[in-house]
Amino acid sequence: MAAHIEFRGVTKSFGSGDTPAALDGLDLTIDRGEIFCIIGYSGAGKSTLVRLINALEHPSSGSVVVDGRDLTALRERELCGVRAGIGMIFQQFNLFRSRTVFGNIAYPLKIAGWPADKRKQRVAELLAFVGLTEKAWAYPEQLSGGQKQRVGIARALATNPGILLADEATSSLDPETTADVLALLKRVNAELGVTIVVITHEMEVVRSIADRVAVLEAGRVIETGTVFEVFSNPQTTTARRFVGTVLRNQPGAADVERLRGKHSGRIVSARIQDDGRLGSVLSDAVGRHCVRFEIVYGGISALQGRSFGSLTLELIGEPADVDALIADLRGATEIEEVAA
């Protein structure tokens, strides 16, 4: 895919030189037509990154490139043209309370100079797309949180942007409404071809919607990859913590103590991979090694059409036989010994 948004050595600082940079030498490429999630804890630099994409902030050094244009080299009038191609939705919806749903969606079209008949036609199209035709003349206070966010999405799409920025757009919604909004964003991406950048601190959002993800910490990208890559084999402590909030495939310290108290055999955790080699080794465990096994913890998940996870096994047999089986297991996948 062609790059749609690029950060090239971007640093952004606020205040004096003693203040840590909000972004610190950041390099990142977001491809055209993908859903890209950026996840990180508070203060990681996520919101600053978004404001650089739509040129509401300017980098202290480095360059931000959108559609092949270096934003740092553009004049304000040219930046206005770039911003016109970028829609944005927010955590708190940011709707005009005094305007109807129709009026909120029509507002950016009016600012852009669309004639009244074209505005009416476009708003009708967007209301149908987000499933709110019957709410056209309602006011924001008459809407649920999910409906407000649908209005926000429709408004952000009004001028046919090529990029949609979603800054914590579901963090104030309940799980069911969040799922509905994420499904709508998937439609926006699939049917309209819009590149979507999602800023979030919720790994469930990443799992549900993203093609790729970057983990941001202290203004730097510390890990990036497809959602499957990051979920199935996180490389950094921060990524592992985030993944652990939605997946409990491996036992924690309390789980290990409980397993040790209930099981006398050796306990190992085996990473599940898509190639099926672990299953082949385990199927030979009794016949080849005279070792019995029991699954005592773990789980398997599916992402992007592939399976991954971890199984924690109790291995029961003579020590030499168990050693031989563990050696075979290590040849098939990653093995961590939990308890001898």
UniProtKB/Swiss-Prot annotation:
Its EC number is 7.4.2.11. It catalyses: L-methionine(out) + ATP + H2O = L-methionine(in) + ADP + phosphate + H(+); D-methionine(out) + ATP + H2O = D-methionine(in) + ADP + phosphate + H(+). This is Methionine import ATP-binding protein MetN. It is found in: Cell membrane. The keyword Cell membrane applies. The gene is metN. It is an enzyme of class 7 (translocase). CDD domains: ABC_MetN_methionine_transporter. Keywords: Amino-acid transport, ATP-binding, Cell membrane, Membrane, Nucleotide-binding, Translocase, Transport. Pfam families: ABC_tran (PF00005), NIL (PF09383). ATP binds at G40, Y41, S42, G43, A44, G45, K46, S47. GO terms for cellular component: plasma membrane. Signal peptide: none annotated.
